[in-house]
Amino acid sequence: MESTDSSGGPPPPQPNLPPGFRFHPTDEELVIHYLKRKADSVPLPVAIIADVDLYKFDPWELPAKASFGEQEWYFFSPRDRKYPNGARPNRAATSGYWKATGTDKPVISTGGGGSKKVGVKKALVFYSGKPPKGVKSDWIMHEYRLTDNKPTHICDFGNKKNSLRLDDWVLCRIYKKNNSTASRHHHHLHHIHLDNDHHRHDMMIDDDRFRHVPPGLHFPAIFSDNNDPTAIYDGGGGGYGGGSYSMNHCFASGSKQEQLFPPVMMMTSLNQDSGIGSSSSPSKRFNGGGVGDCSTSMAATPLMQNQGGIYQLPGLNWYS
């Protein structure tokens, strides 16, 4: 088959298009508004698709012959028969061949209130060399052909009996496949994985900030499965220290106030049980003061201080 160098000859005329114009037609639009009009010799909406016999060129020569396009290129091309009396198209090119892949996809038109098959879309891949030992390339072709071709008359069949022309026009979209999309997808998933790891690490740090309780501060009421208030406070100054749980005892009656503060922060005094500047006697705790003293201690002692959006107990250094 004759080969033509893409570097020779004048470049195809460029269409007069407005700035920012993009050509991204659907399959239906390609068949109805371009291929069908071309086959019927009707003027096209815009002269943006060049007439090129694709099988006389290798795919890397075609972008220079296109009227428009940067990443994909559109052409009107004739199709020839592989054998004079057969219906198989000739897919041979200059230094290789086009091989069909997958099954034909119907092009459906939804205009007029119904669905109608108006064309067929076929996907092909270019192979360098000769079949069946060709080397697969990244060049892809989408070939569109009409399905409503008029039946061939007997006289026409006699005139075309020795002709190799199978179709006067098919519409082809050519592009080169690359791995940039897959690479970007993998890169995106990698970043998501890293972000999740950092998020989990930050949450572990925040959890450890509250999990590692300083020595001398105990939480049997929080981490115990026993809901009996008498098991939490034994009425004396020993054990876990009654003053440390005066808040929990006050809210044990079912008041809605127990929902306002996390259990880990329900302490009236951080100096009790820790041995830091406190000489309070058991008489000032539950066994000496009763529930009324509990309410008084709640009003007199600031429970939490807002530091940077985190409520902390006064007198306790969470970061030591």
Swiss-Prot record:
Q: List, alphabetically, the InterPro entries matched.
A: NAC-dom, NAC_dom_sf
Tissue specificity here reads: Restricted primarily to the region of the embryo including the SAM. Expressed in the outer integument, but seems not expressed in the embryo at the torpedo stage.
> Where is there biased composition of kind Pro residues?
9-18
Q: Where is this region: Disordered?
A: 1-22
Q: In this protein, which residues make up the domain named NAC?
A: 17-177
Q: Where in the cell is it found?
A: Nucleus
Q: Name one GO molecular function term.
A: DNA-binding transcription factor activity
Task: Give UniProt keywords alphabetically.
Answer: DNA-binding, Nucleus, Transcription, Transcription regulation
Q: What SUPFAM superfamilies does the record tag this protein with? A: NAC domain
DNA-binding positions: 118-183
| Gene3D superfamilies cross-referenced by the UniProt entry | NAC domain
What the protein does comes down to:
May encode a transcription factor involved in the elaboration of shoot apical meristems (SAM). Together with NAC056/NARS1, regulates embryogenesis by regulating the development and degeneration of ovule integuments, a process required for intertissue communication between the embryo and the maternal integument.
The protein's name in its UniProt record = NAC domain-containing protein 18
The organism of origin for this protein: Arabidopsis thaliana
Q: What gene codes for this chain?
A: NAC018
